[in-house]
């Protein structure tokens, strides 16, 4: 479920050595399955362990995961990276904002998953996002741009060279194209 690198495991063992006996770590997701989902790691004293917690065993410590967070932490990784600027703990949870969809899910569900987990996080750096409106019978995904993407002068490049290329590679034989249905209006909200 959660892959913790050897360096991160050693880091947790060192941190827990200064805590009361029986203290674990807790890995959790706040607002799982939403665009505002955030992951975190905290200490979990013995009296904070819940009956429905999932207990994961690692080298020298255990990690607790609450029942609600568990499906959103599937394929999560925790690493401890050291470079010239110092060291930091990184937690990557690709399914925190949206649960991974089954391989037999509908085309719309699979496209929506890619949009929420891969494309929108990239567009968010410009304050933008996209939404899937529909997939036509001839396999064209109809999208609507929002936020900073609405009215952006680079929207056509983003659509054709970025989003369409990515989606066609991921869904060969199922998608034939991508079209923008947005009525673009440049304004203060538009990315420049």
From Swiss-Prot:
SUPFAM superfamilies: Fe-S cluster assembly (FSCA) domain-like, HesB-like domain
Annotated cofactor note: Binds 1 [4Fe-4S] cluster per subunit. The cluster is presumably bound at the interface of two monomers.
Gene Ontology annotations of biological process type: iron-sulfur cluster assembly; protein maturation
GO MF term (any one): iron ion binding
Cofactor or coenzyme needed: [4Fe-4S] cluster
InterPro entries for this protein: Fe/S_biogenesis_protein_NfuA (IPR017726), FeS_biogenesis (IPR000361), FSCA_dom_sf (IPR034904), HesB-like_dom_sf (IPR035903), NIF_FeS_clus_asmbl_NifU_C (IPR001075)
Keyword terms, alphabetized: 4Fe-4S, Iron, Iron-sulfur, Metal-binding
Pfam families according to UniProt: Fe-S_biosyn, NifU
Superkingdom per UniProt: Bacteria
Subunit structure: Homodimer.
Protein name: Fe/S biogenesis protein NfuA
Species: Shewanella woodyi (strain ATCC 51908 / MS32)
């Amino acid at each position: 479920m959660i892959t913790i690198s050897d360096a991160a495991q050693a880091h947790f063992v060192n941190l827990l050595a200064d805590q009361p006996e029986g203290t674990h770590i807790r890995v959790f997701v706040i607002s799982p399955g939403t665009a505002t989902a955030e992951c975190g790691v905290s200490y979990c004293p013995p009296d904070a362990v819940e009956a429905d917690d999932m207990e994961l065993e690692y080298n020298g410590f255990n990690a607790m995961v609450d029942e609600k967070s568990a499906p959103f932490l599937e394929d999560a990784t925790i690493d401890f990276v050291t470079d010239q600027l110092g060291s930091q703990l990184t937690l990557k949870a690709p399914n925190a904002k949206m649960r991974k969809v089954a391989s037999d899910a509908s085309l719309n569900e699979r496209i929506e998953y890619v949009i929420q987990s891969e494309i929108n996080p990239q567009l968010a750096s410009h304050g933008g996002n996209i939404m899937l409106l529909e997939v036509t019978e001839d396999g064209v995904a109809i999208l609507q741009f929002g936020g900073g993407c609405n009215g952006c002068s680079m929207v056509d490049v983003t659509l054709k060279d970025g989003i369409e290329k990515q989606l066609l590679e991921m869904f060969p034989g199922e998608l034939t194209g991508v079209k923008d249905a947005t009525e673009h209006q440049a304004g203060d909200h538009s990315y420049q």
